[in-house]
């Protein structure tokens, strides 16, 4: 236990914050190539077929990324943009694919909340 005098001289050292998206290597986004596109089931109590992809990133790491929105055009060898952000009911999925960037098309017929899904404004 330090004395008050020692704390006045040195102070406490803050613990460094641990990143939750290590594979991005400090970048906000990373480009990658889909190695496998498939569906998986969420953990209890939810039930669905969630669309996910295994992606080999430009940093050399292979991660599982979620494909948001209804319907997608991704297949093996598609070039995608990956951002951080986990999916709570899919264990091990800590990344999202950015819709409307590179080979990923935006969500068709989306009217509200379009920004996250790469959907253009309807004329």
Swiss-Prot record:
Modified residue annotations for 3-methylthioaspartic acid: 89
Q: Which superkingdom does the taxonomy of this entry point to?
A: Bacteria
A Gene Ontology molecular-function term? rRNA binding
What InterPro entries does the annotation carry? NA-bd_OB-fold, Ribosomal_uS12, Ribosomal_uS12_bac
Record keyword Ribosomal protein present: yes
Amino acid composition bias (Basic residues), ranges on this chain? 9-20
Q: Which UniProt keywords apply?
A: Methylation, Ribonucleoprotein, Ribosomal protein, RNA-binding, rRNA-binding, tRNA-binding
Q: List the residue ranges of the region (Disordered).
A: 1-21
List the GO terms this entry assigns under cellular component, sorted alphabetically.
Answer: small ribosomal subunit
Disulfide-bonded cysteine pairs: these are none
Which positions make up the signal peptide? none
Q: Which family does it belong to?
A: Belongs to the universal ribosomal protein uS12 family.
Q: What binding partners and quaternary form does the record give?
A: Part of the 30S ribosomal subunit. Contacts proteins S8 and S17. May interact with IF1 in the 30S initiation complex.
HAMAP family assigned to the protein according to its UniProt record, in alphabetical order = Ribosomal_uS12_B
Query: What role does this protein play?
Result: With S4 and S5 plays an important role in translational accuracy. Interacts with and stabilizes bases of the 16S rRNA that are involved in tRNA selection in the A site and with the mRNA backbone. Located at the interface of the 30S and 50S subunits, it traverses the body of the 30S subunit contacting proteins on the other side and probably holding the rRNA structure together. The combined cluster of proteins S8, S12 and S17 appears to hold together the shoulder and platform of the 30S subunit.
This protein is called: Small ribosomal subunit protein uS12
Q: Which gene encodes it?
A: rpsL
